[in-house]
């Protein structure tokens, strides 16, 4: 588990490095599917003092099996997503400014250009709001459930992120570092969309053929972007 702890530690340290978190407002996890264990950031521990050995290991029920700290308060959300989507290898949650602004506005982040289309196949959706009963009940678990409800049967790696209404963004990927990469992109395209709509409030979505081209050349079966 030490290798995964180091990976999750480094991915968590990338959050302040890329300007995605203030104070302790974020967390990253990864999963060992063979062993059914998840490694996640400890709750409320400052990034400046955090070490790889501080990462917490939990089983799929959320029970701590290794670590001195309590796991992130969002652990139940991470676990629910891992249970539903076998393709996920890493998950990140932040309160990055622009993506969170779209969440607070209750709006999907619109696909307006090729930067967005390189990573997200369509709009980045916004969930519905949670009911009072859902919040007062198993809040973090229900946050995971509303994300799943919103995504439906979509392939999560084609839409590797979402904004939870009145809360903030969650992103995911093949591993912890890929999830952080997608979270960084989400924040950037959220900012671009806000600026672009400010310049032209009537701005429409990217042309579907251009979106298809950009997404498929990076992620499709005949992808040719980058090196093999």
Curated annotation (Swiss-Prot):
GO cellular component: cytosol
Pfam families: Aldolase_II
Induction annotation: Induced by L-ascorbate. Repressed by UlaR.
Reaction equation(s) it catalyzes: L-ribulose 5-phosphate = D-xylulose 5-phosphate
Enzyme Commission number(s): 5.1.3.4
InterPro entries recorded: Aldolase_class_II_sugar_metab, Aldolase_II/adducin_N, Aldolase_II/adducin_N_sf, UlaF
Enzyme class (EC, first level): isomerase
Cofactor remark from the record: Binds 1 zinc ion per subunit.
UniProt keyword Transmembrane helix, yes or no: no
Record bears the keyword Transmembrane helix: no
Keywords: Carbohydrate metabolism, Isomerase, Metal-binding, Zinc
A molecular function (GO) term: L-ribulose-phosphate 4-epimerase activity
BP GO annotations: L-ascorbic acid catabolic process; pentose catabolic process
Residues annotated as catalytic: 118 (proton donor/acceptor), 225 (proton donor/acceptor)
Protein family membership: Belongs to the aldolase class II family. AraD/FucA subfamily.
NCBIfam families registered for this protein in UniProt: PRK08193.1, PRK12348.1
Protein name from the UniProt record: L-ribulose-5-phosphate 4-epimerase UlaF
Species, as recorded: Escherichia coli O17:K52:H18 (strain UMN026 / ExPEC)
